[in-house]
Amino acid sequence: MRCLPVFVILLLLIASAPGVDAQPKTKYDVPLASRHDFAKKTPKRLSKPRDCCLRHFLCCV
């Protein structure tokens, strides 16, 4: 019976600990950008020459 209060306290401490993301971030996780940021980046993207290939058609997007 002496272990029960210790167990309850430990359980409460574990429950109040900060959580960790279950899924690690990947290179495809990007923060949401505002419209202003998008407007500034679009001309830069359009002016860059791109090497598109048949295997990776998404590089042209």
Swiss-Prot record:
Residues 1-22 form the signal peptide. One of its GO terms (cellular component) is extracellular region. Residues 23-50 form a propeptide. The keyword Secreted applies. It is found in: Secreted. It comes from Conus ventricosus (Mediterranean cone). Keywords: Disulfide bond, Neurotoxin, Secreted, Signal, Toxin. Expressed by the venom duct. Belongs to the conotoxin T superfamily. The cysteine framework is V (CC-CC). One of its GO terms (molecular function) is toxin activity. It comes from the Eukaryota. InterPro entries: T-conotoxin. This is Conotoxin VnMRCL-011. Contains 2 disulfide bonds that can be either 'C1-C3, C2-C4' or 'C1-C4, C2-C3', since these disulfide connectivities have been observed for conotoxins with cysteine framework V (for examples, see AC P0DQQ7 and AC P81755).
